[in-house]
Every structure is written in C-alpha cells, then in structure tokens.
C-alpha cells in the first residue's frame, strides 16, 4: 500500500468531514418555533411603532405575522434601517426581510427573493393642464425627484432630464413653481400629492403609464431551497385566501390616506414583464 497516498487521502477526507453543511434554515425556524422578520424601524404604513403601545405595526408587520401563523410559529419582529434590509438577512441575523423590498439585479446577487406579492411603481405627476399623456412624451424634459432615488433612475431611463433635491417637498415645489415639468415618486407619494393639490396650489394629475416597475418580495438567504419553496407556497396560499388583500386594505387601501388598490397576484418573477433595476 502507498502509505503516503493513504495518509494524504485520509487527511483530506478529515477536512471534508470537518466542514459543516449549511444548516437548513426552515428546520431551524420550525425547531425554534420562531420566525425572525426584519421590518422597517419607522416607515409607516409598512412598519413603525404604535404611538400608544410602542409595538411595531403596519403592512409588513401584519404580513410577517400571517406568514408565521401559516408556519405554526411565532413572529419575532426586528426593526432595522433601510440600508440594513439586505445585510441582515444575508448574514443570517434574521430569517426573512419583509420591508417593501424591491427586486434589483444587485440585490438578487446577494439574497434570494420570493415571488413578488405586489409591484411598486414609480409614477409621474404633472400639472392638470399638461398635454403629455405617456412617459415617452416627457423624453428630454426636466422632471424633479429626490436625489439618489429610484425615482431619479426612472427619469434617466426615460431619457428625461433629472432635477434632484434632498427631499420630496422641495422637488414638488419645483414643479409648482414651473422649474420642472413634473415630479417622479412612488405611487403612495404621488397619490397623496395629487389629492392635496385639489385644495392647495396648482392642481396636479398622474400619468397612467408607470415610469418604472419594481416587483416587491420577501428577502431570504441564498441556497435555502426548502425555505424559499415554503415562503412562496405560503404567499400563494395567503393570496388565494384573500389575506394579503385584507392586510393591504387595512394599511394602504381606498379607505386610507394612500387610497391604493392592489391588482396583482403572487406570481413568479419570471412571469412579470419589467426592466430590472441594476
């Protein structure tokens, strides 16, 4: 026998045996009887402290609790910053991130996304007397947004000229003062501003065609196929039962200040027609 070969082989085998396999996160969740959910620390109506109880409340909080209930475990809400949404789940400090997390190519390289449960939109609002009807009508035109935002990216992708500000209020004021032809922001913000303009300032209207589509899903660690499959199955079940719509109506629906309607169904991201954000 070649003892040198045997010794090296045995040593290598020992190294291989010593390396732990990646733990099955779904098994860990079920054993701990706890689903650790990362949500926004203070971004209503998604997740923010209740002024009276100081408990976290909002759309994302209720969705996390609904998922945990389907799994038969307790939901543990962990408030985090906007910037921590991807790192927290990537590093395994939480099991899932439920924080209005839009799909982007860079995020998808780091974490696993569930099937989207709604599609966020970057929308354009303009003065009511503006003749533009679709986003192509605003190519080369100056549009306002917050600096470094998805809204600014949407303007650039439309080949329009971005005029950016540190906050939405300043960007909106620029449109009211005629310094920009329109404002690009998310659906909630633009809806609020259009409603506000009915009684204050220059009346605005929304262009029907979205400037950009952003599928929103749940973030998980990569290489956890059992957890991914289970979360997707739960989302589809909640959607089919009308539970996601109930949560939506409570926090974002027509009877709230946001007056938003959810028309989407939970579907694989591959079935959506959209241009992924880098």
Where do the PLM segments sit?
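A ligand-binding cleft/hinge motif common to bilobed small-molecule-binding domains
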Residues: 84-87, 101-109, 157, 181-212, ...
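Periplasmic-binding protein-like
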Residues: 41, 119-126, 195-235, 254-278
């Amino acid at each position: 026998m070649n003892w040198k070969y045997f010794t090296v082989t045995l040593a290598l085998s020992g190294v291989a045996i010593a390396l732990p396999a990646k733990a099955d996160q779904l098994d860990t969740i079920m054993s701990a009887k706890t689903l650790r959910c990362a949500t926004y620390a203070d971004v209503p109506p998604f997740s923010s402290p209740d002024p009276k109880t100081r408990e976290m409340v909002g759309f994302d909080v209720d969705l996390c609790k609904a998922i945990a209930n389907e799994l038969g475990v307790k939901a543990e809400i962990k408030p985090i910053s906007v910037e921590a949404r991807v790192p927290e789940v990537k590093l395994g400090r939480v099991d899932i991130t439920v924080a209005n997390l839009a799909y982007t190519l860079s995020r998808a390289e780091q974490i696993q996304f569930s099937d989207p449960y709604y599609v966020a939109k970057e929308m354009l609002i303009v003065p009511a007397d503006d003749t533009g009807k679709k986003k192509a009508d605003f190519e080369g035109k100056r549009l306002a947004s917050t600096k470094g935002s998805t809204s600014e990216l949407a303007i650039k992708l439309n080949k329009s000229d971005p005029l950016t500000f540190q906050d939405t209020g300043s960007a909106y004021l620029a449109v009211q003062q005629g310094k920009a032809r329109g404002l690009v922001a998310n659906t909630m913000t633009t809806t609020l501003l259009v409603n506000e303009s009915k009684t204050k300032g220059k009346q605005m209207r929304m262009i029907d065609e979205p400037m950009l589509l952003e599928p929103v899903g749940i973030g998980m660690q990569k290489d956890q196929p059992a957890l991914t499959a289970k979360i997707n199955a739960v989302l589809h079940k909640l959607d089919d039962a009308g539970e996601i719509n109930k949560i939506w109506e409570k926090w974002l629906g027509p009877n709230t200040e946001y007056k938003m309607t959810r028309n989407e169904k939970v579907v694989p991201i591959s079935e959506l027609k959209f241009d992924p954000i880098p």
